[in-house]
């Protein structure tokens, strides 16, 4: 081993079994790509061992300057497949934006920028993230300093480029992650406008798990002899086992509570089809005694950032969300995904279940379906060429629990993670009602989560486990009724990239990766 390798601060090796989605390679190593030593140091210190198939295919082609259209499964290392060549080609001595990475969501932008910083920490490269929902003036001031790699969402990038603040005229590389979403009718006009700010000889890299016809139309117009990579021999990840439970709508909460009590959940993500149902379900889960956060697109951006960081860092076990977090979000500790509301199309389903079983690991996806979902279930099975099985009475833990669970990347040992009250009785969330009360309730609401709340933050949130973090200086005035006072539960104003307030968040136990948050997956 080289001397420089011996001095690296390499994290503990992840010994969990990995599927062929990430192990079926040609045996190429990262050093075979002739990368800068400083970049290799960042790669190995992030815990990367060998390239995954998509990295093995894409990195050398990207380094050769070719346009790329790459299709690979969720959770197989696409982010590093474009971040590594971007960092390799950046010259830190040139004070210009040299790579733009465009992503469709704010959370994915934060995550991707963190991967860039982690892998490029020895390169002296400046990475900036810019998204909607943040202060435009702050972004303009930050761009007055040197920025080598810009990560952002379409609207904000176009705004900055149009004002002449983000100079892309000498940027040789334009990367689009989740390109199918970025080239949907909502975003395509913005992407086309952003392209006009690049030089004519720019390099374009498109990465996604699915590519509809809109992507081909864009490719034909803007890419020059693109190199096409398709590693989708099948659409779903091999490590994810899929089940469905046929449940009446009013019994879904009861079924969810049963799953919580029976499954060995490391971390879980529960999906709903509307923002209203996200908040209602999060409230119900917390009332059952389980730690739970929620996140959806209508939340204030600072709240979304805080929920995302805390869930990623292991502060909470369960997250209820809309399709906001279906794309690209990489949290390796998630081993269970539950579709409380069944998705309407195969693309959404594919991205949802891809939040578990990240980077070749194991996970399960459980779908709670009612009578009206049966046609969608059949249609999704046919389109994806996969089988969604009826849920058995007992689920084999070997399907979703790692043999060496202590090696799962997380800042908190599993024993210390908040688990909630596992022995709640059914009567606590299904109170007995007489016939008149039942009829009245049925007339008011036909779903399992109770009446729809008024607009705005819900009232009487039951403590800090609920996931609605009220920072100091709540923008609508006083925090909602029932919020803990300042200092209770550790609430502090968030910062965009973590927490700078003394004593928050709680520090992980000693001996776990020097107390640092989990490293990004490949």
Swiss-Prot record:
Residues 418-427 have a biased composition (Basic and acidic residues). A motif (Q motif) lies at residues 28-56. It is an enzyme of class 3 (hydrolase). Residues 428-446, 497-522 have a biased composition (Low complexity). Its main location: cytoplasm. One of its GO terms (biological process) is P-body assembly. Residues 59-229 form the Helicase ATP-binding domain. Residues 1-20, 408-522 are annotated as: Disordered. Residues 239-399 form the Helicase C-terminal domain. Gene3D superfamilies: P-loop containing nucleotide triphosphate hydrolases. It is found in: Cytoplasm, P-body. Keywords: ATP-binding, Cytoplasm, Helicase, Hydrolase, mRNA processing, mRNA transport, Nucleotide-binding, RNA-binding, Translation regulation, Transport. ATP-dependent RNA helicase involved in mRNA turnover, and more specifically in mRNA decapping. Is involved in G1/S DNA-damage checkpoint recovery, probably through the regulation of the translational status of a subset of mRNAs. May also have a role in translation and mRNA nuclear export. Belongs to the DEAD box helicase family. DDX6/DHH1 subfamily. The Q motif is unique to and characteristic of the DEAD box family of RNA helicases and controls ATP binding and hydrolysis. This is ATP-dependent RNA helicase DHH1. The lineage of its organism: Eukaryota, Fungi, Dikarya, Ascomycota, Saccharomycotina.
């Amino acid at each position: 081993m080289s001397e420089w390798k011996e001095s690296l601060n390499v994290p503990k090796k992840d010994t969990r079994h990995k599927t062929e989605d990430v192990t079926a390679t040609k045996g190429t190593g990262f050093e075979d790509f002739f990368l800068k030593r400083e970049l290799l140091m960042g790669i190995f210190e992030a815990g990367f061992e060998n390239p995954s198939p998509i990295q093995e295919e894409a990195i050398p082609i990207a380094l050769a300057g070719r346009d790329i259209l790459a299709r690979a499964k969720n959770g197989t290392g696409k982010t590093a497949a474009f971040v590594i060549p971007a960092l390799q080609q950046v010259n830190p001595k040139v004070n210009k934006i040299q790579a733009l990475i465009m992503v469709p969501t704010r959370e994915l932008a934060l995550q991707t920028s963190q991967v860039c910083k982690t892998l490029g920490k020895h390169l002296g490269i400046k990475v900036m993230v810019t998204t909607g929902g943040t202060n435009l003036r702050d972004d303009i001031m930050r761009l007055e300093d040197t920025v080598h790699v810009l990560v952002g969402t379409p609207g904000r990038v176009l705004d900055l480029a149009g004002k002449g603040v983000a100079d892309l005229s000498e940027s040789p590389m334009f990367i689009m992650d989740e390109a199918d979403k970025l080239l949907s009718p909502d975003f395509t006009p913005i992407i086309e406008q952003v392209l006009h700010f690049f030089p004519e000889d720019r390099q374009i890299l498109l990465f996604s798990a699915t590519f509809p016809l809109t992507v081909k139309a864009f490719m034909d117009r803007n890419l020059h002899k693109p190199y096409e990579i398709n590693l989708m021999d099948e659409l779903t990840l091999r490590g994810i086992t899929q089940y469905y439970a046929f449940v009446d709508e009013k019994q879904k909460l009861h079924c969810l509570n049963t799953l919580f009590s029976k499954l060995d959940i490391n971390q879980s993500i529960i999906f709903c089809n509307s923002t209203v149902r996200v908040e209602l379900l999060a409230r119900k889960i917390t009332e059952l005694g389980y730690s739970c956060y929620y996140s959806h697109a209508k939340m204030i951006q600072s709240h979304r950032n805080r929920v995302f960081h805390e869930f990623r860092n292991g502060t909470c076990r369960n997250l209820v969300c809309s399709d906001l977090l279906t794309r690209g979000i990489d949290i390796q500790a998630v081993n269970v995904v539950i579709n409380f509301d069944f998705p309407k199309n195969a693309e959404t389903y594919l991205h949802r279940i891809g939040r578990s079983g990240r980077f070749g690991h194991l996970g399960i996806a459980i779908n709670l379906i009612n009578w009206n979902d049966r046609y969608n279930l059949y249609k999704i099975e046919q389109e994806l060429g996969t089988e969604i099985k009826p849920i058995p009475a007992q689920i084999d833990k070997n399907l979703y629990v790692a043999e060496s669970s202590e090696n799962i990347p997380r800042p908190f040992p599993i024993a210390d993670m908040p688990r909630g009250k596992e022995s709640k009785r059914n009567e606590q969330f299904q109170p007995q009602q007489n016939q008149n009360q039942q009829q009245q309730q049925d007339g008011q609401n036909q779903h399992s989560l109770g009446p729809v709340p008024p607009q705005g933050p819900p009232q009487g949130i039951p403590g800090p486990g609920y996931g609605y973090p009220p920072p100091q200086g709540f923008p609508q005035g006083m925090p909602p009724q029932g919020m803990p006072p300042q200092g209770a539960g550790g609430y502090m104003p968030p910062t965009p990239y973590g927490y700078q307030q003394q004593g928050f968040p709680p520090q992980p136990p000693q001996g776990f990766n020097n107390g640092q948050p989990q490293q990004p997956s490949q």
